[in-house]
Regions:
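TPR/TPR-like (Sel1-like) alpha-helical repeat modules
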Residues: 268, 628, 730-745, 752, ...
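Short helix-capping/linker turns of helical repeat alpha-solenoids
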Residues: 114, 133-136, 149-151, 169-172, ...
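Hydrophobic face of amphipathic alpha-helices that form TPR/SEL1-like repeat modules
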Residues: 109-113, 130, 142-149, 178-185, ...
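Canonical positions in the second alpha-helix
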Residues: 129-130, 166-167, 202-203, 234-235, ...
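Acidic, low-complexity, intrinsically disordered interaction modules
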Residues: 35-71
Length: 787
């Protein structure tokens, strides 16, 4: 018995009739008639044998007992009217029964045929008849699919849910799984994990692998790990790659099952060989870190590559890292950038950060700070802490953007609050120096401490400084030493240097020059210029090490070449006096000048001396005064004294006794004995100041009590002659002897004069010479007398 499909389409009138896919010619007059009149024959100009006869005329099967299956596409009321007429006019009782029994299967069959032929609209209509009129759950599922995907009908997730539910309530596992997905993903209904789990579990108990996997996920979300493992296992046994992957994670971490990393790797492999990208990436992790398998970077690279080619962003990023570092593959920065870009374009923050690094450092791509900032910003806006830190640094240093300390603080704070130690350290600097925020030593110390406790050596050093100097912390040198030691152990050269200073001074630790030397040496060997300079001092003076002036020169040279002004000055002294190196006044001047140009007041003073005496340069008192002034204006007491003498005697500068006194005063305020003596001379002789012998004695005494031989000599003269003090030969002799003991030649002459007699005129001459500071003449006179 053959089955013949009759398809009738109706809108406002009869549109078409197809018999086994062949369209019937319908007179226009028939199309507009009521449904019942389609079945009646028409005579006259319009030839129409009635629908039943016309169908049979198109039936080429020649079977008397052919069964006709009718599909009416149109309004429901017209359909019911049509089907009633079919039973009345077209078919016998036996055929009608066959249609009722077999039509629902025919609709499904026809729908599948239309689907295969690519006629989505006709497929939907056929499924709809089977679903609506016959309640077939598989058809209801297909109708829901059509609504969900907009296939053959306007997309409607709400309608999809209606039909999934009809099928699900008839225990259709696929529909139950799909309905669970709707509740889980809020497709056509409000999100409801409880309902999702109910329908997933209903499908899962029927053996639906996808539902078993999703049931496992929902239980895992509730931390019901044992239940999750149960359902993952069932799905994994059906080779569901997603379930194998999730079950692998459970075995790796021991969630809901005993930890078994080898089992985890095995499950990742099963999912990976099925092409599941997440599992391929995870298997790459296993080989990269030796998780459950022997570490094999080449295998790791291969699995990352497989996942990366499928678009897995994390695998693409890891592939970039492997190409960057030459791990598991030949180093190729260009390839690295390519993979970072793919992952970054997908929005992976870590890859965006890595791509920023490539642009900032010119790795595999032309250096471009602006592009670096662009990618750092994208990652930072996703709250990727490392990128927030680097973006903060860019604003702090002006890399790719204008320096903006407030913006720097904003990003550094975000990273610091996520625990990035480097960000905490730099944020501490911002609070310490007042960059982008108000200066706050307490906050600076607090951020240093957070970073220091994470092992950040720079913060440990800074925290040590806080404790040493009472910055945001109570002063505690022992605590300072503790943090310096931690930083020094991490190789921080600044901390090693400061620790050396603590051992040198005995701050927070017992004084120990050998330990100080070792700390300075470690720091110096790392290139710390200050430590190199200090190490030179230790070698020069034999502090904690055998004295070695050649080594002193070596370390001064290293520091000097780094621009350390103190070392440059010291190196100049070494060359001037031939200490540890052959005497070379030309090189002495060279290093003095470098140091002086760097603002070192001692070098400026020394350069002034060289110009005053013509050592290594043409004697030039004007230039001498110029360099003395530079040093004096920086507060160097001896240079202030020297500049005072230049004004006092008009050496290289216009004679001005008042300015001389002004500079002597600046110098004596710092306790300079030579200036005290010369200020005494000014008071004694009334140069630049009103004559006052008592004041003169006061300043001579200050100078003398510091052990300055010329001050002692002048004070002795006052006692001998009763100038500003009562005449006192014994005190005069006492101070002359002190001056003589320190090699002041005029003092020897004065002592012998007092102990003999008749040389008063010579004494008066010597005292006069002392008053104007002509020491060399007094010394010469002393030697003559002694001879």
């Amino acid at each position: 018995m053959s089955k013949i499909q009759v398809e009738v389409s109706f809108t406002d009138e009869l549109e078409s009739i197809r018999v086994d896919g062949k369209e019937m010619e319908i007179p226009k007059a028939i199309k507009t008639k009521p449904v019942e009149e389609w079945f009646e024959p028409t005579v006259g100009r319009v030839r129409w044998g009635g629908l039943g006869a016309e169908i049979k005329e198109m039936d080429f099967s020649n079977e008397k007992n052919a069964v006709y299956s009718f599909l009416f596409i149109g309004p429901e009321d017209k359909k019911q009217e049509f089907m009633a007429c079919v039973e009345r006019f077209c078919l016998g009782e036996e055929a009608q029964q066959g249609t009722k029994k077999e039509n629902e299967q025919d609709y499904l069959h026809n729908a599948q045929n239309y689907q295969q032929a690519g006629n989505a609209e006709m497929a939907f209509q056929q499924y709809m008849v089977a679903a609506r009129d016959y309640g077939r759950p598989e058809a209801q599922f297909e109708v829901a699919q059509c609504y969900q995907n907009g296939t053959g009908v306007e997309k409607s997730e709400e309608n999809a849910v209606v039909w999934y539910k009809k099928a699900a309530e008839q225990s259709d596992a696929k529909a139950q799984c799909a309905l669970g997905a709707c509740y889980y993903q809020a497709l056509g209904v409000e999100k409801d994990d409880k309902e999702a789990r109910r329908w997933y579990e209903a499908a899962a108990t029927q053996g639906n692998a996808t539902a078993q996997y999703m049931t496992g996920r929902l239980y895992a979300a509730l931390s019901y790990n044992e239940a999750a493992v149960k359902w993952y296992t069932k799905a994994a046994e059906q080779e569901c790659p997603e379930a194998q992957y999730e079950l692998g994670k459970c075995y790796e971490t021991g969630d809901g099952v005993g930890e078994d990393k080898a089992k985890a790797a095995e499950l990742y492999r099963k999912a990976a060989v099925q092409g599941y990208a997440e599992a391929q990436k995870k298997l790459g992790d296993c080989y990269s870190h030796g998780i459950g398998v022997a570490k094999d970077l080449e295998q790791a690279f291969e699995w990352y590559r497989k996942a990366a080619k499928q678009g897995n962003a994390k695998a693409q990023n890891n592939l970039g890292i492997f190409y960057t570092d030459g791990v598991g593959v030949t180093k190729d920065p260009v390839q690295a950038v390519e993979w970072y870009e793919r992952a970054a374009e997908q929005g992976l923050a870590e890859a965006q950060h890595n791509l920023g690094f490539c642009y900032k450092n010119g790795c595999g791509v032309e250096e471009n700070y602006e592009k670096a900032v662009k990618w750092y910003r994208k990652a930072a806006e996703q709250k990727y802490a490392k990128a927030q830190f680097v973006l903060g640094k860019c604003y702090y240093y002006g890399d790719g953007v204008e320096i903006d300390y407030e913006e720097a603080v904003k990003w550094l704070r975000k990273a610091a609050e996520q625990g990035i130690a480097n960000a905490q350290d730099l944020l501490g600097d911002c609070y310490y120096y007042g960059y982008g925020v108000e200066t706050n030593n307490w906050m600076a110390a607090a951020w240093y401490e957070k970073a220091a406790k994470q092992g950040n050596e720079y913060a440990q050093y800074s925290l040590g400084r806080c404790y040493e100097n009472g910055i945001g912390k109570r002063m505690d040198c022992a605590e300072a030493v503790k943090w310096y030691e931690k930083a020094a152990e991490g190789g921080n050269a600044d901390a090693q240097r400061e620790l050396g200073y603590c051992y040198y001074c005995g701050k927070g630790v017992k004084k120990d020059l050998k330990q100080a030397f070792e700390c300075y040496r470690k720091s110096a060997e790392q290139g710390n210029a200050t430590a190199q300079r200090n190490l030179a001092i230790f070698y020069k003076n034999g502090y904690g090490v055998t004295q070695n002036k050649e080594e002193a020169v070596k370390w001064n040279q290293k520091a000097a070449e780094q621009g350390n002004a103190e070392a440059q000055n010291s190196l100049g002294c070494c060359y001037k006096w031939g200490e540890g190196v052959e005497k070379d006044l030309g090189k002495a001047i060279e290093w003095y000048r470098k140091s002086a140009d760097n603002g070192n007041e001692l070098a400026q003073y020394n350069l002034g001396l060289c110009y005053e005496h013509g050592d290594g340069v043409t004697k030039d008192l004007g230039k001498a005064a110029e360099w003395y002034r530079k040093s004096a204006e920086q507060g160097y007491a001896v240079a202030q004294y020297k500049l005072g003498r230049c004004y006092d005697y008009g050496d290289g500068i216009e004679h001005d006794c008042q300015k001389a006194v002004e500079w002597y005063r600046k110098s004596v305020e710092q306790g300079c004995a030579m200036a005290q003596c010369d200020l005494g001379n000014c008071y004694k002789q009334g140069r630049g100041v009103e004559k006052n012998l008592e004041k003169a004695v006061e300043w001579y005494r200050k100078s003398a009590e510091q052990g300055y031989n010329r001050g002692q000599f002048c004070l002795a003269g006052c006692f001998e002659n009763g100038e500003g003090v009562p005449k006192d030969k014994e005190k005069a002799l006492q101070w002359y002897k002190k001056a003589a003991d320190q090699g002041f030649g005029g003092a020897e002459w004065a002592i012998n004069n007092m102990q003999s007699s008749g040389i008063g005129s010579a004494l008066e001459f010597g005292a006069a010479m002392a008053a104007v500071g002509v020491l060399e003449k007094l010394e010469r006179l002393g030697k003559i007398f002694k001879g």
